[in-house]
């Protein structure tokens, strides 16, 4: 792809510009306008809605409220690509030349031989079968838009001319007045004008798992975070709301993400690039040799027809016909193996991409963490207690004997609206489903585990009044009867933002006794609050108060709207803090990535402090590495005075990222080894991925929301979450983690590296036999000897004996250094490099050719033709009219007899290639280790050795083969001609690998380590 900058077509330029516009943050101003201004802007009435005629006009202008599907490639085009791409073209040319040669022969001779006809048919069949196979494997296409379609709401409740009406969502237009209620999907982007207890689930868009409250007030400059906008295709969870439509179809926020995901040019996968490079290389060699010898044979005086037949022979000998099938089978096998390890690979070539990954951008919630809020710490009796956050409750426990803890657990259980869903008595507490928000269910599970049934506690302390949590007073309060029948006081319990709770208290509970809340205790509270907050935890304060019986007698009517009871001078009990804890297997996985040279970057929408705490917990920021803020705190200097290059780690806030240029982003990615991006938006995730790719990294990205789909699509490999992932993210991804676990990615990396190694080995094995296939033709033309190996016999090797052994190398186990190497550099570290070619063609291949020729000369000599009399004999040998050709001993040979000897030589040459390929298969098992270290555990490979030998014997001895393939039975002794050469190959390569291991980086490694 040259630089098409100047000649860029207007369409291409426009496409590029649109994408850049999409990458910018969502630009909206409606949330900052008053309701009247919004209605004026869209010419609508906030009570009556639009008129029918106006709505029709707008619908005609803007088009339906639907997403446009992306352009797709027709299936027949894809099929043709498989049939006419790469090697296939060469083989087609070969097949056409065969038919051509047969045609010429049929026209000029009385009894044309059918060789060329059969060969042409076989070549065409090979191409069609491998083409169908590859097409079948690749028959998954961009289904991104289809999953977006499922997300589009079907019906909408619209108010027009003051009447409520149900419309198809596609007919909703800008300016329409729309109502949504709990359970509805939002039909377009709305500016809320009135709401009652409305909450929406924006997780598919922003990744925030908590339902977000919606109200008419502008609460944030960023339209994605403000409360008065709801977005197309998010879900309304509870309550009702009414709003004015401000965008429809592709112009909605969700529509822009859809366009962004389908509009991204997806680059070729690294393995596709490698295979293409390899095909060009081999094709180049084949065409060059074919044409050179075509010209040479014409100069040497052969006829056109003979020259064409040579050309076909050389092309057939040069092209590894079975190779593309081998590659596809290798990738399919690995994909199956990964599916067993919870990685579902959608795009076969992505398997290898994962192996060359050098940067992983991972989500935090649910990928690195368990995706369940859990109580992590408590502060009571003036000390911090640690709770157990492990998935299987194998961690620490704390002292539950204090009376303060009893009071604290009471408040946490009673001042809590979360309940376990029914019918889960036999399910472990941590696995139970809860109705209620994340923090409350964390408290519920914690109390249930440590203090027994919360349900019983609530039955004994009947609730008589409650003020639910709201954002203005930031607390939740309830009033209960006490369980002691002799105590007629009411118990008031309250939880909320710690500083707000503390302000309402005048005493504090220590060891179960109330003490006055003095400055010293306030400072202790402040320190505990800061410490827990600094761990990235979400802290809540708890207090209680027994209402005096004389003021609040039994049956007192508590009024929660116009509060008629005491809500200050309460007694502070303690703090509890919650966090979504890291998954158990993640720190180990991050460590493995580090030793494999892979940089792990955390990208999250969460708060920087929480993000940093989790990053330290899982080892993304390793012990002893500091951020700029840490250095500033340690040296007691302002952050601006610290040189950013001194800090190995850094935490970048989304708002800062928004204002950075590409150069600044590159600077960060180059200078810091451990990076956390917090509070990022989906567009920023895409910018981070592109930044890493500018550095030349191969990037894997994990994501689960719709918001992640552009980044998943842009990354070299997108990894979606199987359990929590939205449909859209699964469609955009190349791979799905069925258990949502980061550790599975590392398994994937190992498998990806293994497949690359094994493909190299497979190709090295397959290419080596090209030399003993080509050299017979060269000598046939140059030295004028009878043909040592026929074209049909070559196909028997490439599509017969070599297939199973080549595929068996895909089952080879990893060598010991696989996860200790740096990721491969796609620019310099090719699948097929000069060293592999020099080993296969220049060294091992040459020894194999010698073995073949040795068998050939032995058989002819045994029949009376010594090597000395063979040179220059070809013209008389192939002449049908000469039936009295003399050998070295003066015996006369007819044409038919000569041909039987020649075909026996073909068979012997074929068998000797099989024998030397035994050794080649065994040495290809390893690239660096000795075969004795690696062992012979690969059962498929052992089967391959036996299978190719059995096939060779079958082709040689089966009756009728002399007619079908011109294979003749051999004397047993002729099988042994190639044995010494096979042994030589094995010894030669073991010595080479020994030198390799003894002198790493030495001359032998530079020249021969592929």
UniProtKB/Swiss-Prot annotation:
Residues 96-118, 296-307, 780-789, 854-905, 958-972 are extracellular. It catalyses: K(+)(out) + Na(+)(in) + ATP + H2O = K(+)(in) + Na(+)(out) + ADP + phosphate + H(+). Residues 1-21 are annotated as: Disordered. The modification Phosphoserine is found at residue 930. One of its GO terms (biological process) is intracellular sodium ion homeostasis. The chain crosses the membrane at residues 75-95, 119-139, 276-295, 308-325, 760-779, 790-810, 831-853, 906-925, 939-957, 973-993. It is a multi-pass membrane protein. GO terms for molecular function: ATP binding; ATP hydrolysis activity; metal ion binding; P-type sodium:potassium-exchanging transporter activity. SMART domains: Cation_ATPase_N. Mg(2+) binds at residues 704, 708. Residues 69-71 are annotated as: Interaction with phosphoinositide-3 kinase. The keyword Transit peptide does not apply. Its main location: membrane. Keywords: ATP-binding, Cell membrane, Ion transport, Magnesium, Membrane, Metal-binding, Nucleotide-binding, Phosphoprotein, Potassium, Potassium transport, Sodium, Sodium transport, Sodium/potassium transport, Translocase, Transmembrane, Transmembrane helix, Transport. InterPro entries: ATPase_P-typ_cation-transptr_C, ATPase_P-typ_cation-transptr_N, ATPase_P-typ_cyto_dom_N, ATPase_P-typ_P_site, ATPase_P-typ_TM_dom_sf, ATPase_P-typ_transduc_dom_A_sf, Cation_transp_ATPase_P-type, HAD-like_sf. One of its GO terms (cellular component) is endoplasmic reticulum. Its EC number is 7.2.2.13. It is an enzyme of class 7 (translocase). It is found in: Cell membrane. Residues 1-74, 140-275, 326-759, 811-830, 926-938, 994-1010 are cytoplasmic. This is the catalytic component of the active enzyme, which catalyzes the hydrolysis of ATP coupled with the exchange of sodium and potassium ions across the plasma membrane. This action creates the electrochemical gradient of sodium and potassium ions, providing the energy for active transport of various nutrients. Belongs to the cation transport ATPase (P-type) (TC 3.A.3) family. Type IIC subfamily. The sodium/potassium-transporting ATPase is composed of a catalytic alpha subunit, an auxiliary non-catalytic beta subunit and an additional regulatory subunit. This is Sodium/potassium-transporting ATPase subunit alpha-3. It comes from Gallus gallus (Chicken). The gene is ATP1A3.
């Amino acid at each position: 792809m040259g630089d098409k900058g100047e000649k860029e077509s207007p369409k291409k330029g426009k496409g590029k510009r649109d994408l850049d516009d999409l990458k910018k943050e969502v630009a909206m101003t409606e949330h900052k306008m008053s309701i009247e201004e919004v209605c004026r802007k869209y010419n609508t009435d906030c009570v009556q809605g639009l008129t029918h005629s106006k709505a029709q006009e707008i619908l005609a202008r803007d088009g339906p409220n639907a997403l446009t599907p992306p352009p797709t490639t027709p299936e027949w085009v894809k099929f043709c690509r498989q049939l006419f791409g790469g090697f296939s073209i060469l083989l087609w040319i070969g097949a056409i030349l065969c038919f051509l040669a047969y045609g010429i022969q049929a026209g000029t001779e009385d009894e044309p031989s059918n060789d060329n006809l059969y060969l042409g048919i076989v070549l065409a069949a090979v191409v069609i079968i491998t083409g169908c196979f590859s097409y079948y494997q690749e028959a998954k296409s961009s289904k991104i838009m289809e999953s977006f379609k499922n997300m589009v709401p079907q019906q909408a409740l619209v108010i027009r001319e003051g009447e409520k009406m149900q419309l198809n969502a596609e007919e909703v237009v800008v300016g329409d007045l729309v109502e949504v209620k709990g359970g509805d999907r939002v039909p377009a982007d709305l500016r809320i004008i009135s709401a009652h207890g409305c909450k929406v689930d924006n997780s598919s868009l922003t990744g925030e798992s908590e339902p977000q409250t919606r109200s008419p007030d502008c609460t944030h400059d960023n339209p994605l975070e403000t409360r008065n906008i709801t977005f197309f295709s998010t879900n309304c969870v509870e309550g009702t709301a009414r709003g004015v439509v401000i965008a429809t179809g592709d112009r909605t926020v969700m529509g822009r993400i859809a366009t962004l995901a389908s509009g991204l040019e997806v680059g070729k996968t690294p393995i596709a690039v490698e295979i293409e490079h390899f095909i060009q290389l081999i094709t180049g060699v084949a065409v060059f040799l074919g044409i050179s010898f075509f010209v040479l044979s014409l100069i040497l005086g052969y006829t056109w027809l003979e020259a064409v037949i040579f050309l076909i022979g050389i092309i057939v000998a040069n092209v590894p016909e079975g190779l593309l099938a081998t590659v596809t089978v290798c990738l399919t096998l690995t994909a199956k193996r990964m599916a067993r390890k919870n990685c579902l690979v959608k795009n076969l070539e992505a398997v290898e991409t994962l192996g060359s990954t050098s940067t992983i951008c991972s989500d935090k919630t649910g990928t690195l963490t368990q995706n369940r809020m859990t109580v992590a710490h408590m502060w009571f009796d003036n000390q911090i207690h640690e709770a157990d956050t492990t998935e299987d409750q194998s961690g620490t426990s704390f002292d539950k004997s204090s009376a303060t803890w009893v009071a604290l657990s009471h408040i946490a259980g009673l001042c809590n609206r979360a309940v376990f869903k029914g019918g889960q008595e036999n399910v472990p507490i941590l696995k139970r489903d809860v109705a209620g928000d994340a923090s409350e269910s964390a408290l519920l599970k914690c109390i249930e585990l440590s203090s027994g049934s919360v349900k019983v506690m609530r039955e004994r302390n009947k609730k008589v009044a409650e003020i639910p949590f709201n954002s203005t007073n930031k607390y939740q309060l309830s009033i209960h009867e006490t369980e002691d029948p002799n105590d007629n006081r009411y118990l008031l319990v309250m939880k909320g933002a710690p500083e707000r709770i503390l302000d309402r208290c005048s005493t504090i509970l220590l060891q179960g006794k109330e003490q006055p809340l003095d400055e010293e205790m306030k400072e202790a509270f402040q320190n505990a609050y800061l410490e827990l907050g600094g761990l990235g935890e979400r802290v809540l304060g708890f207090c209680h108060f027994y209402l005096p019986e004389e003021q609040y007698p039994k049956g007192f009517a508590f009024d929660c709207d116009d509060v008629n009871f005491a809500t200050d001078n309460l007694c502070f009990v303690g703090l509890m803090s919650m966090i979504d804890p890291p998954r158990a297997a993640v720190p180990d996985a991050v460590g493995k990535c580090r030793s494999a040279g892979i940089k792990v970057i955390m990208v999250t929408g969460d708060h920087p402090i929480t993000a940093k705490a989790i990053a330290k917990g899982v080892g993304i920021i390793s012990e002893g590495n500091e951020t700029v803020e840490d250095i500033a705190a340690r040296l007691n200097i302002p952050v601006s005075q610290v040189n950013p290059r001194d800090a190995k780690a850094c935490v970048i806030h989304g708002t800062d990222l928004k204002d950075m240029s590409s150069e600044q982003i590159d600077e960060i990615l180059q200078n810091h080894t451990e990076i956390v991006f917090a509070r990022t938006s989906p567009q920023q995730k895409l910018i981070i991925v592109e930044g890493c790719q500018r550095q030349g990294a191969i990037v894997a990205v994990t994501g689960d929301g719709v918001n992640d789909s552009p980044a998943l699509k842009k990354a070299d490999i997108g990894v979606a979450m199987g359990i929590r992932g939205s449909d859209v993210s699964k469609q955009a991804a190349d791979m799905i983690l069925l258990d949502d676990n980061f550790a599975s990615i590392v398994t994937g990396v190992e498998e990806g590296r293994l497949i690359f190694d094994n493909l190299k080995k497979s190709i090295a094995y397959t290419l080596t036999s090209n030399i003993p296939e080509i050299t017979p033709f060269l000598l046939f033309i140059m030295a004028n000897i009878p043909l040592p190996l026929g074209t049909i016999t070559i196909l028997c090797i490439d599509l017969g004996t070599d297939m199973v052994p080549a595929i068996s190398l895909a089952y080879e186990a990893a060598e010991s250094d696989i996860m200790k190497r740096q990721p491969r550099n796609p620019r310099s570290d090719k699948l097929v490099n000069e060293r592999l070619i020099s080993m296969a063609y220049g060294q091992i291949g040459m020894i194999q050719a010698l073995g073949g020729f040795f068998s050939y000369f032995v058989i002819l000599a045994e029949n009376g033709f010594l090597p000395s009399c063979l040179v220059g004999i070809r013209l008389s040998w192939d002449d049908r009219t000469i039936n009295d050709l003399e050998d070295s001993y003066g015996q006369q040979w007819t044409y038919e007899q000569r041909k039987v000897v020649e075909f026996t030589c073909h068979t012997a040459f074929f068998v000797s290639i099989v024998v030397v390929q035994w050794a080649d298969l065994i040495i290809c098992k390893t690239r660096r280790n000795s075969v004795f270290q690696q062992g012979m555990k690969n059962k498929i490979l052992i089967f391959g050795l036996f299978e190719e030998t059995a096939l060779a014997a079958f082709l040689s001895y089966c009756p009728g083969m002399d007619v079908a393939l011109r294979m003749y039975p051999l004397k047993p002794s002729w099988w042994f001609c190639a044995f010494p050469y096979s042994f030589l190959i094995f010894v030669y390569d073991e010595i080479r690998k020994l030198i390799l291991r003894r002198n790493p980086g030495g001359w032998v490694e530079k020249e021969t380590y592929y």
